[in-house]
From Swiss-Prot:
It comes from Wolbachia sp. subsp. Drosophila simulans (strain wRi). The gene is lipA. SUPFAM superfamilies: Radical SAM enzymes. Keywords: 4Fe-4S, Cytoplasm, Iron, Iron-sulfur, Metal-binding, S-adenosyl-L-methionine, Transferase. InterPro entries: Aldolase_TIM (IPR013785), Elp3/MiaA/NifB-like_rSAM (IPR006638), LIAS_N (IPR031691), Lipoyl_synth (IPR003698), rSAM (IPR007197). This is Lipoyl synthase. Binds 2 [4Fe-4S] clusters per subunit. One cluster is coordinated with 3 cysteines and an exchangeable S-adenosyl-L-methionine. PANTHER family: LIPOYL SYNTHASE, LIPOYL SYNTHASE, MITOCHONDRIAL. Pathway: Protein modification; protein lipoylation via endogenous pathway; protein N(6)-(lipoyl)lysine from octanoyl-[acyl-carrier-protein]: step 2/2. It holds the Pfam family LIAS_N.
Length: 287
């Protein structure tokens, strides 16, 4: 595995606020993608009381080659999860929350109803908190993402992850054009919802392929794109091709804005929910 360049070295997670956030998460039996996916930004985000909550358990039914989340046979759904989540958000005094999940291909609706219950429960307890969701593709789960769109999260995020050529290797159980269809339909069903998608680089894609993904996302009327460096979690995961330089990320940002995205986050440490509250405020200012 390649040694990390200086620009990818994040501070170790420490501090009083970090520990308070950790304690609240554990107290309410919540999982976070920050921990499960070993996010490099956990120290910075948790010290700001920003955490991305992962619902539907901590075990995924897929095994994408880039992802560090555990795979296998998941536990049954926790019926108290939506209420526990809402209570934790109130205790953390979050102005903006990001909710994601593992894939649950074992469930008839892929877990869509749990997303909806979380949205409803949060709005019962704290109506001022804006809600961003990051969902799986709900492949072959008819009506699943459509129902979530009707529930009106403030932001609907679904990550395209990589270029079409690399799907068979990186996301073997996903379909590129289905993900585009999901994003396009969410916007058609509920035009008030901001749509967002993310892309990893450093997996062997070309610049031309990245520009084509940008065009495809704009054709689906996606408002916001995130572009970040792929970091290989373990030697068993998809091999890192190279580290993309900060200057290249700036170039991608320039190109993405020129193609019509309302907001672009593009840097080595950019992740789907990194600076999500600040970026949501930027989105609102564009409308």
């Amino acid at each position: 595995m390649h040694s990390k360049p200086q620009w990818l070295r994040a501070k170790a997670p420490t501090g009083e606020v970090f520990n308070e956030t950790l304690n609240i998460v554990k107290l309410h039996n919540l999982h976070t993608v920050c921990e499960e996916a070993a996010c490099p930004n956990i120290g910075e985000c948790w010290n700001k009381r920003h955490a991305t909550v992962m619902i539907l358990g901590s075990v995924c039914t897929r095994a994408c080659a880039f992802c560090n989340v555990a795979t296998g046979i998941p536990d049954k759904l926790d019926p108290h999860e939506p209420e526990n989540l809402a209570k934790a958000i109130k205790k953390l005094n979050l102005k903006h929350v990001v909710i994601t999940s593992v894939d649950r291909d074992d469930l008839p609706d892929g877990g869509a109803n749990q997303f909806i219950q979380c949205i409803e429960e949060i709005r019962k307890i704290t109506s001022e908190t804006t809600i961003e969701i990051l969902t799986p593709d709900f492949l072959n789960k008819k009506g699943a993402f459509e129902a979530i769109a009707v529930a009106s999260p403030d932001v609907y995020n679904h990550n395209i992850e990589t270029v079409p050529r690399l799907y068979a290797k990186i996301r073997p159980r996903a379909r590129y054009f289905h993900s585009l269809y999901l994003l396009k339909m969410v916007k058609q069903i509920n035009p008030k919802v901001f749509t967002k998608s993310g892309l990893m680089v450093g997996l062997g894609e070309t610049k031309e392929e990245i520009f084509q993904v940008m065009d495809d996302l704009r054709s689906a009327e996606v408002d916001f794109i995130t572009i970040g460096q792929y970091l290989q979690p373990t030697p068993k995961h998809a091999k890192l091709d190279r580290y993309v330089t900060p200057e290249e990320f700036e170039h991608y940002k320039y190109i993405a804005y020129s193609k019509g995205f309302l907001v672009v986050a593009s840097s080595p440490l950019t992740r789907s929910s990194y600076h999500a509250e600040e970026d949501f405020n930027r989105l609102k200012a564009c409308r």
